[in-house]
Amino acid sequence: MKKKQKFIAPIYGLKKTPKQSIKLDKSILIRAVDLLTEEHKYLEKFGLKGSYDAVLEVNYEYDSDNPSEPFPGLFINLINKIDASLVVYGDGVVGVAGVAPAPKEEFSGGGILSSSARPRYEEKLDKEIDENFASYYKKFVIAYDMRPVAFDVYRRSCDRFSNNDRTIDSCTVLESLFVPLGERSKKSFILNGLNILMFSTDEIKTIDDIVEYRNAIIHADRKRQLKLLTGSKYTYKWFEDVFKLIRRILYKYVDNPWS
């Protein structure tokens, strides 16, 4: 049986509260947390205790006879996509903290905490959420539907700490974007894809280097890893710059997707 349910999902990592409500589509709205109704205290009942500046308001339609609805279906069908759109939109620690039924909604399933991130001010998203985000989101949905693995792997990778783990994730993202299924010459397709997106020679060389480092990891070539890491290139800052470059590649793909 078809059923509609309203949920709210707080967003962490915004430097500013949205000045006005932003409609992403007919069923999704981003708005400020309602302080008059003490919405922040309501969210705390579901373990969502962060200092949030905005929430997603979602009118979710689902089949109540399906055991995977509304959870985890809501995440698989919608929340993960919006979460990915936020982390690709700009540099910073940002995302959807969890989901709770909207106040006064009749729902017995409770809520879900998906992230307990508490970014410092300087770590927060370097862009405002406004009408520009709404325009970007429309394009993002098209790109996400074409390359869901690339965006979901990047989204999950943002919560990881090991440079080796994030390096493997980054190369998985690039392969998902640029390499045809079953193709073995992966690096050449990746570098050619970056050329098509008009990245600079230096940026393409950086991706070449991270692919080489990933190859040393997955082939358990410890000698090669140590040789690379003892040089002057593979510093903490270098890895951080590479991971930011991966985000920019995804952002540019949103502007210019191809199948």
Language-model regions: role of each:
Residues 1-165, 243-244, 249-253, 257:
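Charged, non-catalytic interaction/linker regions at domain boundaries
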Residues 79, 165, 171, 210-211:
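Residue-level recognition of hydrophobic positions within alpha-helical transmembrane segments
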Residues 107-117, 128, 167, 201-209, ...:
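Charge-enriched, short contiguous segments at helix-coil
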Residues 143-144, 183-187, 214-215, 222:
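A glycine-rich, aromatic-flanked flexible loop/lid motif
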Residues 154-158, 195-197, 227-232:
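Glycine- and acidic
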Residues 166-204:
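Flexible secondary-structure boundary motifs
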